[in-house]
């Protein structure tokens, strides 16, 4: 699990070990600035799905759940209103990943991805499982029961436990 990492966090030996772990069926969960990490490592770029571009100030927005059959989203409301720091991405990951939820840019200011703004996604990647959410910047996120349940289910999914 990469929880709010930024920049280069693994050296070459650690990267090789991490790649072996994933290729042997290991799971990965990325939270928030995990998308602002390891820009020069192609394997990680594919694993994370999309890299961070920028963000507006923290504000309330509506998340629309697209895939409510995934364990991490099954217990969430179809329209989930949360306050957080909302990331824009360098490219849209749709097509490379299974988009679980999108951000409704009509409900906040500062979005740059228009009508299709994925905010959480999952995929199988080179033998392992990868799950990412752009949520989780604020301390309040980790006191929010729905967010914690969502994150816990994502961890279990990535581990292959559900």
What would you call each of these model-derived segments?
Residues 50, 54-127:
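Catalytic beta-strand/loop cores that center a nucleophilic Ser/Cys/Thr
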Residues 32, 55, 137:
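Histidine-centered active-site/metal-ligand motif
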Residues 27-29, 98, 129:
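Proline-centered loop/turn at the N-terminus of a beta-strand
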Residues 14-17, 40, 68, 147-151:
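Stable alpha-helical elements in mature extracytoplasmic
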Residues 11-14, 39-41, 111, 142-143:
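Short glycine-/acidic-enriched loop or helix-start segments at secondary-structure transitions
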Residues 108-116, 124-162:
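Extracellular ligand-binding/catalytic regions of CAZymes and related secreted enzymes
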Residues 36-47:
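Glycine-rich, charge-decorated loop segments at or immediately adjacent to ligand/cofactor-binding or catalytic sites
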Residues 1-38:
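Short alpha-beta junction capping motif
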